[in-house]
């Protein structure tokens, strides 16, 4: 048995740069730009999904993308400096789609005949709902309530939650890749080939460029290939879905984007407030808290840091609430969460440096003001990003499951909790999503639209369903007798900021701010 024994390891050993170590500046800049290119996929996808339904034009969509990128840069910088201080990119969230769809379909907005006017009024309604709903994260974060709740977490409970943060994104993987298999599949194979089979090839000095910059290299190659296919007329006469997924000549997005535009608060006009809209939006805020918590825990492991203590998690959620407030003030059209794909990129490149993400935030802010520049990159076909998602989401899921090494997986109790939370965490949201797709309304369908949006949003989130099941069962089944089996002897020292000496190294605030905001 000794030959097959792999003792649990608190920190991953295969990473080259941890949270506090930094690559050389030229490498840092390229890695930061790679993070920017990756987060563009979600930043362009959400407005493409929502803006037309709101009545917006291509010009409106370009402006929303700019605003989303600009605010994402600010949120990422704030989170990396004053929040969890983990190398996590904060961007637009798809968890907000259901409550936003409820607002879009509000009868008072639907009766506006002019499309542009309807877009403006809908955007203002979304802004008002985000501003009110942001108070949930701000209060739960800065009051340390979320930190108190996190004391119920254990390695056994967090393994399926973090796993579902990755696995729950499966619809953005091969289903989107398959819409243009001739672009998506080569991208998938190329990334796997370069990062796994050619990672030791170093044509330039000692930098493993294929492992360090796979997105820059692969996106460039496959994008050029896609341009050639489009120019050669390969998609002429093809179904509209194929053309939309494969073609690169999205001239409207580029032509309607301004050369220079500086997003500013209340640029769409004063927000409007509705009790129903705000309650509906609160569900998405709760979901994004759960998903971000799982993403933070995954990011900490991929950055060779300790699991974030309760105080740090609460601090991060509080700053994320500030981010949602900024979304409402600027009008990004959606709320925010930690982008799971960028967390996966830490593992793919083996670089967990905080500085890389901070520089990436600078790219987001600067390039968001240069409309045409950002629009060019935003026109990268979705299947290219879907291929990356297959790898990166899967990697985050595996990081989550790696927490099971600290538990006793020969225990039927632990097997039951892990299996049930993983299975139902995928099965329940999929059932809700299929119901929505078939009928264009959720499984919960009463006369109270805000109530429908609230519950449907909660149960369409794999990580949230997984958290409810895993944490409840883990804290109600043979708790005292199973402390060691649950992994608590290892986990308990990370509950408090001073429980492990390394926490101070990883999570202390800059500029000596801990004097004014001491850990609780």
Swiss-Prot record:
Keywords for this protein: Membrane, Transmembrane, Transmembrane helix, Transport
InterPro entries: NCS2
Record bears the keyword Membrane: yes
Protein's membrane topology: Multi-pass membrane protein
Protein name in UniProt: Nucleobase-ascorbate transporter 1
Disulfide bonds: none
Subcellular location: Membrane
NCBIfam families: NCS2_1
Family affiliation: Belongs to the nucleobase:cation symporter-2 (NCS2) (TC 2.A.40) family.
Top-level taxonomic group: Eukaryota
Gene Ontology CC: one annotated term: plasmodesma
Species whose genome carries this gene: Arabidopsis thaliana (Mouse-ear cress)
UniProt note on tissues of expression: Expressed in cotyledons 4 days after imbibition (DAI). Expressed in the minor and major veins of cotyledons and leaves, in the shoot apex and pedicels. Expressed in the root meristems, root tips and lateral root primordia.
Membrane-crossing segments per the record: 36-56, 64-84, 86-106, 129-149, 150-170, 174-194, 213-233, 279-299, 362-382, 384-404, 415-435, 453-473
GO molecular function, one term: transmembrane transporter activity
């Amino acid at each position: 048995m000794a030959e097959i024994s792999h003792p649990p390891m608190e920190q991953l050993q295969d990473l080259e740069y941890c949270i506090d170590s930094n690559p050389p500046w030229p490498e840092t800049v390229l890695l930061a730009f790679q993070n920017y290119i990756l987060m563009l996929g979600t930043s362009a996808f959400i407005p493409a999904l929502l803006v037309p339904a709101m009545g917006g034009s291509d010009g409106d969509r370009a402006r929303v993308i700019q605003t989303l990128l600009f605010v994402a840069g600010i949120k990422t910088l704030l989170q990396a400096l004053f929040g969890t201080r983990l190398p996590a990119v904060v961007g637009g969230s798809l968890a907000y789609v259901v409550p936003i769809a409820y607002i879009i379909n509000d009868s008072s907005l639907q009766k506006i005949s002019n499309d542009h006017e309807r877009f403006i009024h809908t955007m203002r309604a979304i802004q008002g709902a985000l501003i009110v709903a942001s108070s949930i994260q701000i209060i739960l974060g800065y009051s340390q309530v979320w930190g108190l709740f996190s004391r119920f977490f254990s390695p056994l409970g967090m393994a399926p939650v973090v796993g579902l943060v990755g696995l729950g994104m499966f619809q953005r993987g091969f289903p989107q890749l398959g819409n243009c298999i001739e672009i998506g599949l080569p991208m998938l194979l190329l990334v796997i080939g370069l990062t796994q089979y050619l990672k030791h090839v170093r044509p330039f000095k000692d930098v493993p460029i294929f492992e360090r910059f796979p997105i820059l290299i692969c996106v460039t190659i496959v994008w050029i290939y896609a341009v050639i296919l489009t120019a050669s007329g390969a998609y002429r006469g093809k179904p509209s879905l194929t053309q939309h997924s494969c073609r690169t000549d999205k001239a409207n997005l580029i032509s309607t984007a301004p050369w220079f535009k500086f997003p500013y608060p209340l640029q769409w006009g004063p927000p409007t407030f509705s009790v129903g809209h705000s309650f509906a939006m609160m569900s998405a805020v709760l979901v994004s808290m759960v998903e971000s918590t799982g993403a933070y825990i995954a990011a900490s492991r991929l950055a060779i840091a300790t699991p974030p203590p309760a105080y740090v998690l609460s601090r991060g959620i509080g700053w994320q609430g500030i981010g949602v407030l900024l979304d409402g003030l600027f009008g990004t059209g959606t709320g925010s969460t930690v982008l799971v794909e960028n967390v996966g990129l830490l593992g793919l490149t083996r670089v967990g440096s905080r500085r890389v993400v901070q520089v990436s935030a600078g790219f987001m802010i600067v390039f968001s003001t240069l409309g045409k520049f950002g629009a060019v990159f935003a026109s990268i076909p979705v299947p290219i990003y879907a291929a990356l998602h297959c790898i990166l989401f899967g990697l985050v899921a595996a990081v989550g499951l790696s927490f099971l090494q600290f538990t006793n997986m020969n225990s039927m109790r632990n097997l039951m909790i892990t299996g049930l939370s993983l299975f139902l965490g995928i099965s329940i949201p999929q059932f809700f999503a299929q119901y929505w797709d078939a009928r264009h309304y959720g499984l919960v369908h009463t006369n109270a639209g805000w109530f429908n949006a609230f519950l449907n949003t909660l149960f369409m989130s794999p990580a949230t369903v997984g958290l409810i099941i895993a944490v409840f069962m883990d804290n109600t089944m043979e708790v005292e007798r199973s402390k060691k089996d649950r992994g608590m002897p290892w986990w308990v020292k990370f509950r408090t900021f001073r429980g492990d000496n390394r926490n101070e190294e990883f999570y202390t605030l800059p500029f000596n701010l801990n004097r004014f905001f001491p850990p609780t």
